[in-house]
Amino acid sequence: MSQLPTDFASLIKRFQFVSVLDSNPQTKVMSLLGTIDNKDAIITAEKTHFLFDETVRRPSQDGRSTPVLYNCENEYSCINGIQELKEITSNDIYYWGLSVIKQDMESNPTAKLNLIWPATPIHIKKYEQQNFHLVRETPEMYKRIVQPYIEEMCNNGRLKWVNNILYEGAESERVVYKDFSEENKDDGFLILPDMKWDGMNLDSLYLVAIVYRTDIKTIRDLRYSDRQWLINLNNKIRSIVPGCYNYAVHPDELRILVHYQPSYYHFHIHIVNIKHPGLGNSIAAGKAILLEDIIEMLNYLGPEGYMNKTITYAIGENHDLWKRGLEEELTKQLERDGIPKIPKIVNGFK
């Protein structure tokens, strides 16, 4: 029996819809659960941003260069690309309507698609709509609940895809920058586009830097002795990334941050255009921590660094850590804080 093709287009065509996991009208993102060849699959579709024919920089009075977006006369622009119009209503000087804009795979694609296949139950929980809670993770809670979970997530080949990128040349055509030598392996890292970025519009630039060090899974593993390493990383990122995009983005226009809890437990850094509002909670308080703040905080936490700090963050009910102990701990925290329990029946606001 011949093996079915596993290229992206063939897999998408074989996708059998099961349910909608999540739909966000603000970010224009929808996640669908389905199957491909009887194995679970997740497709995430995101509406692409409007594209301009060219982005350039022109010098301004303060010596900086400012972005100039032009060539909206392009046939695929949001003006000349209009093929159909339907007015919704108008009032005085205000008009509302719908339009169909000419699409082209290279110049003006409709959406960006991400596929996870085969998808694990952990993937499905991550993309499924869920309630979130703020929890205070103490050092004791980390060692008792979170650390065993992280160790489990780092075993059984769950990080194989990361090692493929670092050592096996996977996604090599997408790598923006690589700094690695056997002599200074622990200082090495590489930068590549995050799945959240369409790779075309710099306003939504979203990159990820993955380090070669394996002793750091999360910020919990950062000690005071790592402070200079983080400073060097931060400075290298701010020096390198602008040049990779012809200086259309400046060093001080990069939001450089770390997630806790991260989506995978190999230390990595998010690099986002400051114009980008983020998708979901990717740059929100309770998830994102600026690298500059991490570096500064290490000045005050002592030799053990973040291992001795209580960290407050948002956790979804679908996350395995919620049922492994964080839900119970949060209930205890609310009781200790004197926060009254929510009534079982709430009739509405008075």
UniProtKB/Swiss-Prot annotation:
Subcellular location: Cytoplasm; Cytoplasm, Perinuclear region; Cytoplasm, P-body
Gene Ontology cellular component terms for the protein in this record: cytoplasm; m7G(5')pppN diphosphatase complex; mitochondrion; nucleus; P-body; perinuclear region of cytoplasm
Active site, UniProt feature: 268 (nucleophile)
Keyword Oxidoreductase: no
Further comment found in the protein's record: Present with 9920 molecules/cell in log phase SD medium.
GO terms under biological process: cellular response to starvation; deadenylation-dependent decapping of nuclear-transcribed mRNA; nuclear-transcribed mRNA catabolic process; nuclear-transcribed mRNA catabolic process, deadenylation-dependent decay; nuclear-transcribed mRNA catabolic process, deadenylation-independent decay; response to heat; response to nutrient; response to osmotic stress
Organism name: Saccharomyces cerevisiae (strain ATCC 204508 / S288c) (Baker's yeast)
Protein name as annotated: m7GpppX diphosphatase
Description of post-translational modifications: Phosphorylated. Phosphorylation occurs upon glucose deprivation.
Family named by the database record: Belongs to the HIT family.
Keywords of this entry: Acetylation, Cytoplasm, Hydrolase, Phosphoprotein
Pfam families in UniProt: DcpS, DcpS_C
Motif range (Histidine triad motif): 266-270
Phenotype for residue 268 to N: Loss of function
Function: Decapping scavenger enzyme that catalyzes the cleavage of a residual cap structure following the degradation of mRNAs by the 3'->5' exosome-mediated mRNA decay pathway. Hydrolyzes cap analog structures like 7-methylguanosine nucleoside triphosphate (m7GpppG) and tri-methyl guanosine nucleoside triphosphate (m3(2,2,7)GpppG) with up to 10 nucleotide substrates (small capped oligoribonucleotides) and specifically releases 5'-phosphorylated RNA fragments and 7-methylguanosine monophosphate (m7GMP) or tri-methyl guanosine nucleoside monophosphate (m3(2,2,7)GMP), respectively.
Phosphotyrosine sites (modified residues): 70
Post-translational modification Phosphothreonine, affected residues: 66, 120
PTM-bearing positions, type N-acetylserine: 2
Assembly description: Homodimer. Forms heterodimer with DCS2; the interaction inhibits the DCS1 scavenger decapping activity during post-diauxic growth.
Domain notes: The C-terminal histidine triad (HIT) motif and the N-terminal domain are required for the decapping activity.
Keyword Hydrolase set for record: yes
